[in-house]
Curated annotation (Swiss-Prot):
GO terms for molecular function: manganese ion binding; RNA binding; RNA-DNA hybrid ribonuclease activity. GO terms for biological process: DNA replication, removal of RNA primer; mismatch repair. Manganese or magnesium. Binds 1 divalent metal ion per monomer in the absence of substrate. May bind a second metal ion after substrate binding. It comes from Pseudomonas putida (strain ATCC 47054 / DSM 6125 / CFBP 8728 / NCIMB 11950 / KT2440). This is Ribonuclease HII. PANTHER family: RIBONUCLEASE H2 SUBUNIT A, RIBONUCLEASE HII. One of its GO terms (cellular component) is ribonuclease H2 complex. Gene3D superfamilies: Ribonuclease H-like superfamily/Ribonuclease H (3.30.420.10).
Length: 207
């Protein structure tokens, strides 16, 4: 049985903000901002990594139905490569908060840094396992990104993307070395850059 966070901790017009996808070698970094409704409890909210896939999917629908406002945003691979992953994540978080149709009185950001926002903000280390609104944001972001990675499995077969979701597992690294990077791989990340340079070397030697 999975125990969720205490919904009584939910505060009026406080947005929780979280990201998924800083570590993977491919795909966008996805963020979400959520303002929960204290009058509409959602049972079982917790850090998305502590929940089963089926539970995350069920909570995703419930959060979308019951939240006062939510926004799912992203920074694309091209932005990650041009800005760096930290700055791209901050940009995606900024987009998520700006996309809320209700202006929060405070934004609580998972982690130890805050993006530049037009509203007051505070970081909360391990906030996704403490603050219900951040937990809700982590669920929206993770489900969204996982669905995208499963779709990419069909577009770029052979990499196992649907399983590892882009993270640098042995299966992924082996496929990257064997097949080379796809358009969704982050070329600013060392393993991808190494695979790309190796492919370039092979191409040059054949000319």
């Amino acid at each position: 049985m999975q125990i969720g966070l205490d919904f009584n901790l939910v505060e009026d017009l406080v947005a929780g903000v979280d990201e998924v996808g800083r570590g993977p070698l491919c795909g966008a970094v996805v963020t979400a901002a959520v303002i929960l409704d204290p009058a509409r409890p959602i049972l079982g909210l917790n850090d998305s990594k502590k929940l089963t896939e089926a539970r995350r999917e069920a909570l995703f629908d419930e959060i979308c139905e019951k939240a006062l406002s939510f926004c799912i945003a992203r920074a694309e691979v091209e932005e990650i490569d041009s800005l760096n992953i930290l700055q791209a994540t901050m940009l995606a978080m900024q987009r998520a908060v700006e996309g809320l149709h209700i202006t929060p009185k405070l934004a609580l950001i998972d982690g130890n840094r805050c993006p530049k926002l037009a509203v007051p903000a505070a970081p909360v280390v391990k906030g996704d396992s403490q603050v219900p609104a951040i937990a809700a944001a982590s669920i929206l972001a993770k489900v969204t990104r996982d669905r995208e990675m499963s779709a990419f499995e069909l577009i770029y077969p052979g990499y196992g993307i649907g399983g590892h979701k882009g993270y640098p597992t042995p299966v992924h690294l082996e496929a990257l070395a064997r097949l080379g990077p796809t358009p969704i791989h982050r070329r600013s990340f060392a393993p991808v850059r190494a695979a790309w340079e190796a492919r370039e070397g092979v191409t040059d030697s054949l000319i």
